[in-house]
Amino acid sequence: MRNVIAFEQVSLDGFFVDGKGDMSWAHKQDPEWNAFAGSNASGDGALLFGRVTYEMMASFWPTPQAMESMPAVAEGMSRMPKFVFSRTLKKASWKNTTLVEGDVAAQVRKLKSEPGPGIAILGSGSIVSQLAQAGLIDEFQIVVNPIVLGKGRTLFEGVEEKIALKLMKSRAFGNGNVVLYYEPMA
């Protein structure tokens, strides 16, 4: 069975996007962080996005600018299979992308049961909320960024029941980011 990992960027005050829907604040690059991001993108995993995150990612990662600034990540993001959940997107131009329709939890349950590498959710807050509530996320990798936004959308917006998590490990970076690795408690 495939694992589903949510890799999410949040501000110190818990928002994954600011009040205008922007998350450019979450992209603090330095050599240490770039090496970490590159190693994450070098695996055989698959990616899962909602439409908004997909459109943001597809507008940058397949570009020459991305290849110049973070070549390992750009290559990995384009190489990996991508599953995009959308009710409105009719076509996906980024290579290795499959549009998925229907109930998100049911479709991810099906993807998890198929053979293949793990699946990472990047961004896609509403997808994370739905899958967390359905118990379909095996690990949360939460990157806490050293910034206070004051307002925005919380990552688990819409979750109606408590989800107990166990901290497995953490890693601090020189740029101020801290990655917290959580698993749901049984």
PLM ranges: what are they?
Residues M1-A186:
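Enzymes that bind and transform nitrogen-containing heteroaromatic metabolites
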